[in-house]
């Protein structure tokens, strides 16, 4: 909207640039003429004087244009209607009275250009306002969506209550029913909510509501443009060729703007696609690294487990061998013990027999 306002300011400021200021030209040219008549100078001096006068007029025009532009900008900034000065009105009347065909043609061309610019600006501003209104309506609908849902539930409840009331009324038609003020207000509030819920349901069920609304807005714009063209045609007896050219120019300008927007959006999409591909490549790399790390960890764990199991098996086999050796040694020890006992018994017998023989021999000698 700010850009539209600035553009409108520029257009209004530049309109007054087309007006010529001839108020001081007469006063400055008259003494020159008098001097030429009185003194009777040559043509060269007259040309120089006219060139100087033209330069002065140009300077004055520039100053007046700058002043008018500054005043209009001030008035627009403080929301005041720009008041045309009497000096500018006199200049306009003087220009209209001067019958110069070249100036008339240039004015008509400039007028047509400014009219085209004004129409384009007004149409763009109107479309922008309509788009804003559509967006606001969408936002309001989204904000009040839950309210509509609550209203739907309330409407279902009210329907059930109304059915019960109807049954009661059918049963007792002759009996007058008294309703309190609170109940009456509640019923009105519930009925309003039910109407709002019904409208919300129609909006929610109709998915293409906003699309149809945009189409209607486009149709309205086209109708208004046609009406403006017809009014201009009736007011000013001009041929329909420039109007058609204006329509074509407006359409071409819109098409070019849309093409530029599409190109810009396509470039943004391409950039986003490139970023997505980069992130996908990085994601795949990270995934592959994680898979390799997981495999390495699993292999390390399996190796550790296998080594531990081998050590356990070896220790178990060593234990079995040692138990076998111990059992065999224990059996050999028992055998040796039994042998020792037998030998001890034999030795004891042998010693006892020798003692008896020794005792028997001396007795026999006596």
Curated annotation (Swiss-Prot):
The modification Phosphoserine is found at residues 23, 25, 27, 106. Residues 1-95 are annotated as: Interaction with IRS1. Predominantly expressed in testis. Expressed in the adipose tissue (at protein level). In the testis it is restricted to spermatocytes and early round spermatids. Also expressed in cardiac fibroblasts. Induction: Down-regulated by TNF in adipocytes (at protein level). InterPro entries: GKAP1. It is found in: Golgi apparatus. Keywords: Coiled coil, Golgi apparatus, Phosphoprotein. Residues 20-115, 146-175, 228-250 are annotated as: Disordered. Signal peptide: none annotated. GO terms for molecular function: identical protein binding. Residues 47-77, 128-160, 250-299, 326-353 form a coiled coil. GO terms for biological process: G protein-coupled receptor signaling pathway coupled to cGMP nucleotide second messenger; positive regulation of insulin receptor signaling pathway; signal transduction. Interacts with PRKG1. Interacts with IRS1. Belongs to the GKAP1 family. This is G kinase-anchoring protein 1. It comes from Mus musculus.
